[in-house]
Amino acid sequence: MKPINVGLLGIGTVGGGTFSVLARNGEEIARRAGRPIQVSVVADRNLERTRRLTKDSCRVTDDAFAVVSDPDVDIVVELIGGDSVAKELVLQAIANGKHVVTANKALLAKHGNEIFAAAQKKGVMVAFEAAVAGGIPIIKALREGLTANRIEWIAGIINGTTNFILSEMRDKGLSFDVVLKEAQRLGYAEADPTFDVEGVDAAHKLSIMSAIAFGNSMSFDQAHIEGISQLDAADIRYAEQLGYRIKLLGITKRTSEGVELRVHPTLIPTRRLIANVEGAMNAVLVKGDAVGPTLYYGKGAGAEPTASAVIADLVDVTRMHTADPEHRVPHLAFQPDAMVDLPILPMADVITSYYLRLRVADRTGVLADVTRILADQEISIDAMIQREPAEGEEQTEIIMLTHQTRERNIDAAITRIASLDAVKGAIVRLRLEELL
Amino acid sequence: MKPINVGLLGIGTVGGGTFSVLARNGEEIARRAGRPIQVSVVADRNLERTRRLTKDSCRVTDDAFAVVSDPDVDIVVELIGGDSVAKELVLQAIANGKHVVTANKALLAKHGNEIFAAAQKKGVMVAFEAAVAGGIPIIKALREGLTANRIEWIAGIINGTTNFILSEMRDKGLSFDVVLKEAQRLGYAEADPTFDVEGVDAAHKLSIMSAIAFGNSMSFDQAHIEGISQLDAADIRYAEQLGYRIKLLGITKRTSEGVELRVHPTLIPTRRLIANVEGAMNAVLVKGDAVGPTLYYGKGAGAEPTASAVIADLVDVTRMHTADPEHRVPHLAFQPDAMVDLPILPMADVITSYYLRLRVADRTGVLADVTRILADQEISIDAMIQREPAEGEEQTEIIMLTHQTRERNIDAAITRIASLDAVKGAIVRLRLEELL
C-alpha cells in the first residue's frame, strides 16, 4: 500500500529519536499500521546536522513553512517546541488540511482551545500523546481506555527532573541546591532549570490531562503552580518519619464546586505505589468511579521514549486519516459540542490535608496555644512529632499532620499561630494527599 | 443521534456491573462516544434476577441465541464465560454481522484464531479489553499505545487470587493452605480454586498479550504453566532475605530462537515497582525497545473494574462501527496478512536465573560437591545463604541464586546434585527474573 508521508519539523532530541525509531522499526510499524510511514522531508535550522542524520533518505530544508504547505506531506510532526513559531506552523498546517502530531505541551496548554477548534473546523486530527509523560500512553488511557468512567481525580509525577532531585535529596540527605547541580551535571536538569523546578512544565501537562478527563476547556492560565526550589531537606526527613514521601504532584480533581488544578510538593503515604516512583521516572494515578485507581508508569522524557509516543500517534493518524471525522476519537476526549465550562477552584477553596512545621520556644503552654487556634478553625490533628531540644537549646520544632480542611482555614490558622510570641520564624506548610 | 443498541449475554457479576455503570454514567459516556449506548435486550438463564436488575428498562429473555440474531442489536456483549456455548454464540453473532465485545479470556486463548478469522472475513469487530487484567487498559496500550516499539518482553501479575495469597503468605508467614481458606472466605478465591491457583487463568491472559505483542498467532496450547499450590512459605522468607519477592508472573519474551510463554512463581528484586503490587491488584510490565519499561496497574477483576473495560470497548466499537474495516485497529495489533508464526520455545530452552534450596547433611565437602556440579554445567552462583544448623540438628539448608543459564542445564545439574549422598529430599527450584 502507498506509504504515508510525514513532514518532520525539528530534528533535535525527540525529532532525532523519531527519525531513528521509524528507520529501525519501520517494517514492524508498517505491519501494524497497514502501510509504511516514511519521513519525506525534514525541516531544521541546522542543515548540516539534518543531512548527517537523514543520510540522503529524504529531502531536507531549513524552511519549516515550506513543509506545512508541501502538497506531498500528509502529516506534519511538530517537534520545534515553544509557542510562537510552533503555533504559526501548526495553525498553517491545519489550514492546509494536514494532520498534525506534536509533543508541544506548552503550545497545547496555552493555545489548545484555539488549535483544536481550528482542527475541528478543518476536519483534521491533532495528536499529542508525546506532550504528556513521554512514552507512557496516558492520553490514550484517559481518552479511550477509561471512557466508561466518571474520572474523579488524577495525580501525576509528570516531571522527571524534579522527581530525580527529590529522590536524591531523600536518599542522600542533601539540599536542593546541591542536588540541582548534580542533576545539571548528569543532564537531568537544564542550565536554566526554572521551567522544571518551579512546576511550570508539570502544570502544562496537568492542564492537558484535566481537560481530557473532565471534558473541560484547557485552563492552564488558572492553574496553581508551586515548585520544589524552596523545599527543605528537613521536611523530607520528618515526612519519612511520619510514613510519607514528598513528591511534586500535578493534581486535578472534580468537586461539586468546580475543578482543582494544582502543582505543588505533596506528602503521600510511603506504601502507595506512586510514592515509590524514583529517579527521572514518571507515573500517573487516575481514579475512575468504575475502575477504581489505575496507574501508568514509564520514562517521561528522552529521545526514544518520546519518539514512541510520537510514532504511536502517527500510526493512529495513518489508520484514520481517510475516515470520516465522526469515527475519530475527539481531541479532548469528549465530542466538541459536549464540552463544558467547569470553573477552576481558587486554592483557598481547595480541601486537603496539611503538614506543618513550627519552630517554637521550648516552654510549656505553646502546644496548647497552637492546638487551640487549630481547633478554632475546626482543624483536627492526625499526627505530631515534637523534637526533643538538644542540651542547652532554647528552641525546638513541632511537626503536625492535619486532617482535611479548606486551604483558607489553614491559612487563617497559620497567620494566628505565626503571631504567637513563642513561635519563631516562618511556618512551613506542605499539602498531603492520601490518594485513595 | 440515534442510540447504539447492545444485546447483553449474561447479567452476572460483570454483566450486572456493565448494566449499572452504563445506567449511572450514560450521559457522560454519550458525550464521549457521540451517541447514547443503550442495552436493548438482556439474555440470562435467571429471568427473575434479570427482571429485577433491569427494572423494565429493556427487553429480557432466556434465549441468548435469539439475541445474536436480533436485527435490532448492533453489538453483542458476551459475558457468559466458558468456551462451549459462548463460542457458538460469538461465532453466530459474527455470522449475523454483529460486532462483539467479550471478557472471555478462555474462549479467546483457545479459539481466538478461529474467531478473529471469522470476524475479519465478515468485517466486524471483536473487542476484548476486559479479557486481560480487568479495568487496566493494557490491550489498548499494547495494540495502540506502543505501536512504535519492537516489544521485547511482558511480565504480568494478572491473577488477583494468587497475588492476594502470595501477599498474605509473606505478610503473615502462613502456609498456602491456610491462606487459601482465608481467601475463599473473603471471596478472593473460588470454591474450586484450581483454575486460578494452578496458573491456567493467568496463562489465558498471557497468551492473548503475547499474540498482540509479537504479531503471533494465539498459542495457549503451548504455554508452560505452573501455579503456586506447591510453594513453601520458607522459600518466600529466604527470598526476602536475599532481596527478592515471589510473584506468580506470566512472562512472554521474544528471543532469537522463538517466543517464551510461561506462567510460574518467580523471584523478582524487591525494589522493582511490580514487586510491590500487593493484594488482589494486577500489574503488567512491558519492555519496548524505544519506550523502555512501562507499567500498568489497577484492579484486575470485579464487577465495575471489568465493566469499565467492557464499556471502553463499546465506545470504541460505537465510534468505528460504520467505518471501513481498514480504519480499525487490527484484532491482534498487526494486520491479518502481516501475522507471523514464531515457534513457542520449550521450557528446556528458556534462559533465566534460578533459586535453589537444598537440604543437606551438616558436614564438610558438601558445598564443594554442589558447586563443582554447577560449574560443570557452566552455571555460576550469584548469592548464597547457608543456614546455621540448630543445636543437635544434623541437617541444614543451602539456598543459592544462580546467574542466567538454560533450563536444561540447571535441570541436569539438579539431577546430579540430588543423587549426592549428603543431599536429603527434593531440591526446590524457582525461577528468578531481574525485569530490567
Residue ranges of predicted features:
Chain A
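Short, ordered loop/turn segments at secondary-structure junctions
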Residues: R45-L47, F65, K105-L107, N113, ...
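A short hydrophobic/small-residue beta-strand
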Residues: H99-V101, I381
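Rossmann-fold NAD(P)-binding glycine/threonine-rich loop
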Residues: V85-N96, K105-R143
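A conserved regulatory-domain signal marking ACT and ACT-like small-molecule sensing domains
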Residues: A309, L314, T318-L436
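N-terminal glycine-/serine-/threonine-rich beta1-alpha1-beta2 phosphate-ribose binding loop
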Residues: M1-N96
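Rossmann-like NAD(P)H-binding beta-loop-alpha module
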Residues: Q120-D201, I208
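Substrate-binding/catalytic subdomain of NAD(P)-dependent oxidoreductase enzymes
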Residues: V178-N276, M281-A283, G302
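Low-complexity, glycine/alanine/valine/leucine- and proline-rich hydrophobic stretches
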Residues: H264-D289, A303-E304, A375-E393
